[in-house]
C-alpha cells in the first residue's frame, strides 16, 4: 500500500510538471506578443521587438531573446540589441511574503549615430516624455530587487568613415529598484558601474539611484576616469573647427542628477599630452560667430543658475600644446604654445563658491617663456576677471607668417617680449600692454631674395624705422599701450571678452603700426 502511494505521488508530480512545461510552451508566443504590445503602447517614437520568449513556470522565470529597440525615424541600426534578458523570482524575498525578481541583461549592444541624435533633438516630444518608465513598469508585474547588466557595449558612430567611439566591458549592478526597503524621496538603489572607455581608459561609478523618479531617473554617485584617450573624439571636435591629436584624461568627482537639482563636482582632473588646434577660416566665419553666440547664451544661463551647481576643485593640463590657425589671413599662420602647463582651481558657476584662480606656463612659438596668472569670478552683470601675463624672448623668425599677414614684412632675426595687466569689471576695462622687440633685423638679402623689389624696399624701410626706435644700450624697441574704457558688449561672456582683448592687444599694440612710424619716426 505504501509503495502504491509513492507511485501515485511521483506520477502526480510528473504529470503536473508535464502540464506545466506544456503550458509554458503554448503560452510563450502569446506572452511574447503581449509583452511586445505593452511596451510599444507606452513608447513614443520608438519600437520594441522581442524575437523569442521562454516561460519557465517551475523556476518562476522568463527569458527574452533577441530584444531590439529601434528609432522609428531611423530604424537601422537598432539603438539597443539584447541577445538575452532573464528575470526570475528572488526566493529569499518570497520567504518574507514579498514577490520580487532578479533581472539579468547579457551582452547588450547600444548603437547611437549622429543621424539618430539629430532626429531626437529635432523631435517635438522630449526624451523624458517618451514613456520609457511607463513601458518598463507595464511589463514588470513584480518588483525588481536586483538588476545586473554584464558585458555591455556602447558604440557611437559620428560620420562614416570615421572611427566609432566605444565604451566596452560595461558591467552594472543595481539593487532595490522598486523602493522596497526605502522611504520616498531618497536614493533607494545602490548602484555600481565599471567600463572600458575607447579601448584603454577606465570608467567607474559608485552611488545610489532612484530609477522610478519622474520625469527621469535620479542619481547621486562618485565617479572616475583613468587614462581615457582623447584622440577618439576627433570626429566630434572637427565639427567645431578643432583639430585634436593625442592626450589622455584622468579625474574623479561626484554627480547629483535629480528632477530638481543638478550638481557636477569635479574634484580633480588631469589632461596629459594634449595636442589641440583651433582653425579660423573665411568659409566658417559666420558659423563660428553663431557658435560664439550660443556659447555666450549657455554661459549666461548657467551663471548663478538655481538648482545647477558646476564646480571643479582642481584641473590641470600638463605636457601639452595648444594652437590657433588663421586660414582667413594671407598667408595662413599658426600661433601656439608648447610645453603647456595649465592649473585651474576653484572653478564654479556660482558667486557663493568664490574666485577661480588660473596659472598658465609654456613657450610661445616654441621659444618665448610664457607666464599667465588670472582670477575669474562667475558672471552676474558681465565678465569679472583680472589677468597678468608675460611672454619673454620669443624668436621672431617663428612669427614671420603672422608678420607677413598683418604687417606685410618678416624678420631675419630678433626677439619679442610682451607684458600686460588687465582688469575687467562692471563693463569697464583697465590695464596696459607693453610689447618689446630686441635685436630685430627686418631685411635680409639671402632670406628675401625671392621677393619682388617693392617688398624688399618696404622691409628695408621697416628695418630702418626699428633701428631709429631702438634703445641703443640694449638694442630694444619698446612701446606701451594703455587700455581704458567700456566694453562694446558688456553682456558678452568672459571668454569672448578675453579673446577680443587679446586680439586687440596683439594687432594694435604688439604690431604697433610700422606705417605710422614711417610717416613720423622718432629719434
List the predicted regions and their residue ranges.
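Extended terminal
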Residues: 1-12, 256, 262, 306-313, ...
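N-terminal type II signal-anchor transmembrane helix
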Residues: 1-43, 169, 513, 521-523
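A short, amphipathic edge element
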Residues: 43-51, 415
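Flexible beta-edge/linker motif
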Residues: 52-118, 132-157, 181-183, 188-190, ...
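Extracellular loop and loop/strand-boundary signature of outer-membrane beta-barrel proteins
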Residues: 73-74, 237-241, 405-407
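Gram-negative outer-membrane beta-barrel proteins
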Residues: 111-113, 155, 229-231, 275-279, ...
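Outer-membrane beta-barrel and related beta-rich outer-membrane complex signature
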Residues: 115-117, 279-284, 443-451
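Elongated, acidic membrane-bridging lipid-handling scaffolds
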Residues: 125-232, 296-388, 393-398, 477, ...
Amino acid at each position: 500500500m505504501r509503495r502504491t502511494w509513492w507511485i501515485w505521488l511521483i506520477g502526480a508530480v510528473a504529470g503536473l510538471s508535464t502540464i506545466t512545461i506544456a503550458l509554458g510552451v503554448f503560452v510563450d508566443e502569446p506572452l511574447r506578443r503581449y509583452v511586445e504590445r505593452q511596451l510599444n503602447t507606452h513608447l513614443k517614437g520608438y519600437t520594441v521587438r522581442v524575437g523569442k520568449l521562454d516561460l519557465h513556470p517551475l523556476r518562476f522565470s522568463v527569458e527574452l531573446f533577441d530584444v531590439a529597440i529601434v528609432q522609428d525615424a531611423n530604424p537601422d541600426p537598432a539603438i539597443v540589441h539584447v541577445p538575452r534578458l532573464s528575470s526570475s523570482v528572488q526566493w529569499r524575498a518570497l520567504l518574507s511574503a514579498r514577490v520580487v525578481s532578479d533581472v539579468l541583461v547579457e551582452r547588450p549592444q547600444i548603437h547611437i549615430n549622429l543621424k539618430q541624435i539629430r532626429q531626437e533633438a529635432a523631435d517635438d516630444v522630449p526624451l523624458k516624455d517618451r514613456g520609457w518608465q511607463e513601458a518598463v513598469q507595464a511589463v514588470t508585474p513584480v518588483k525588481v530587487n536586483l538588476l545586473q547588466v554584464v558585458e555591455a557595449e556602447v558604440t557611437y558612430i559620428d560620420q562614416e568613415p570615421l572611427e566609432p567611439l566605444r565604451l566596452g566591458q560595461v558591467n552594472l549592478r543595481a539593487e532595490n529598484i522598486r523602493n522596497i526597503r526605502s522611504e520616498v524621496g531618497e536614493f533607494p538603489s545602490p548602484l555600481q558601474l565599471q567600463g572600458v572607455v575607447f579601448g584603454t581608459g577606465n570608467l567607474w561609478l559608485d552611488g545610489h539611484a532612484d530609477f522610478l523618479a519622474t520625469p527621469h531617473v535620479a542619481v547621486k554617485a562618485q565617479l572616475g576616469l583613468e587614462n581615457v584617450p582623447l584622440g577618439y573624439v576627433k570626429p566630434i571636435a572637427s565639427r567645431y573647427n578643432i583639430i585634436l591629436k593625442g592626450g589622455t584624461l584622468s579625474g574623479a568627482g561626484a554627480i547629483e542628477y535629480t528632477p530638481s537639482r543638478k550638481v557636477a563636482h569635479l574634484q580633480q582632473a588631469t589632461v596629459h599630452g594634449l595636442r589641440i588646434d583651433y582653425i579660423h577660416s573665411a568659409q566658417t566665419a559666420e558659423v563660428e560667430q553663431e557658435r560664439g553666440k550660443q556659447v555666450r547664451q549657455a554661459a549666461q544661463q548657467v551663471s548663478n543658475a538655481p538648482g545647477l551647481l558646476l564646480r571643479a576643485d582642481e584641473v590641470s593640463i600638463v605636457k601639452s600644446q595648444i594652437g590657433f590657425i588663421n586660414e582667413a589671413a594671407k598667408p595662413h599662420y599658426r600661433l601656439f604654445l608648447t610645453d603647456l602647463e595649465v592649473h585651474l582651481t576653484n572653478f564654479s558657476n556660482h558667486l557663493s563658491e568664490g574666485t577661480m584662480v588660473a596659472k598658465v606656463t609654456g613657450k610661445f612659438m616654441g621659444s618665448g617663456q610664457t607666464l599667465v596668472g588670472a582670477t575669474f569670478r562667475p558672471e552676474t552683470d558681465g565678465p569679472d576677471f583680472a589677468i597678468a601675463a608675460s611672454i619673454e624672448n620669443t624668436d621672431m623668425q617663428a612669427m614671420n607668417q603672422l608678420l607677413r599677414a598683418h604687417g606685410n614684412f618678416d624678420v631675419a632675426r630678433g626677439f619679442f617680449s610682451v607684458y600686460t595687466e588687465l582688469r575687467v569689471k562692471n563693463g569697464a576695462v583697465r590695464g596696459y600692454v607693453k610689447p618689446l622687440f630686441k635685436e630685430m633685423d627686418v631685411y635680409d638679402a639671402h632670406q628675401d631674395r625671392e621677393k619682388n623689389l617693392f617688398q624688399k624696399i618696404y622691409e628695408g624701410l621697416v628695418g630702418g624705422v626699428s633701428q631709429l626706435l631702438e634703445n641703443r644700450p640694449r638694442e630694444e624697441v619698446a612701446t606701451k599701450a594703455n587700455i581704458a574704457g567700456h566694453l562694446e558688449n558688456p553682456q558678452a561672456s568672459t571668454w569672448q571678452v578675453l579673446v577680443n582683448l587679446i586680439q586687440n592687444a596683439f594687432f594694435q599694440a604688439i604690431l604697433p603700426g610700422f606705417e605710422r612710424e614711417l610717416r613720423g619716426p622718432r629719434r
